[in-house]
Amino acid sequence: MERSSTSFNFDKIPKFIMKLYKATNNEKYKGICWTPDGLKIHIYDRDVFVKETLPLISKTREFGTFVRMLNSYGFVKSKDIEEEDIYYNKNFRKGREDLLGFDDSLRMIKRKKSSDIRMRIGDGSLKEIVEYLYVQNQELYTELSVCKERIERQERALNGLIEILSRVFRTNSQDLGARIKPSGHNPHNEMDFFLGELSGPLKEGCEPASPPLQDKGIPELSFKPGGIPHADSDTKDDNYDPFF
């Protein structure tokens, strides 16, 4: 059955969806492609996709934020292979660009209130509610994963900083201990310690090292064989009497 052309509105396609479709179709965009059946998008290399392709699709640089955007536009993660990043939307298919603006399935999904959910359940649209709850669960799971990753990264950084500070403290303590020996007093710094050593009391059993005192008023006598003792002096007094 042919779809009515009035249902198609190309102008209503969000820019995010158009950029995502272009990136999935073109092989030059790395890290993302179609699944073999052309019904789902497959992000086969997350690191390459985040580094090279994601900046061309969205302003975000975090994969978790990108997944939340997919969920907000109605994409659901495939249950076939849980460890693979495969997402699908019924109107996002390879070679079917006309489906992008067919209805509101690729429009931004607003969070529904619990009262709206109860009303829809009463109307019998249980399948839609289950799909909505699944999308919300995926979104919360992604947010939790992002928060966990950030916490682990912060813990690693903090542990590394503590280790560096510990090494610096140990090194400084060893250097300070090698320069300053224990003493009877506790100097505030190395200069106080040095001055205290100079002005401190002498240790027991030690005498000051000083030259012997000599009275300058008494000249030192020297004796020569057969001679008269006389004082060693460079100059002699004319009135000097050796027999006085």
UniProtKB/Swiss-Prot annotation:
Chain residues forming the annotated DNA-binding region: 13-108
A Pfam short name: HSF_DNA-bind
Record key words, sorted: Activator, DNA-binding, Nucleus, Stress response, Transcription, Transcription regulation
Residues covered by region (Involved in trimerization): 123-168
This protein's GO CC annotations: nucleus
Protein's name according to its UniProt entry: Heat shock transcription factor
Role this protein plays: DNA-binding transcription factor that specifically binds heat shock promoter elements (HSE) and activates transcription.
Organism (species): Encephalitozoon cuniculi (strain GB-M1) (Microsporidian parasite)
PANTHER family referenced in this protein's UniProt entry, alphabetically: HEAT SHOCK TRANSCRIPTION FACTOR (PTHR10015), HSF-TYPE DNA-BINDING DOMAIN-CONTAINING PROTEIN (PTHR10015:SF206)
Listed GO MF terms: DNA-binding transcription factor activity; sequence-specific DNA binding
Oligomer and partners: Homotrimer. Homotrimerization increases the affinity of HSF1 to DNA.
Family (UniProt): Belongs to the HSF family.
Chain segments carrying region Disordered: 204-244
Localization of this protein: Nucleus
Biased composition (Basic and acidic residues): 231-244
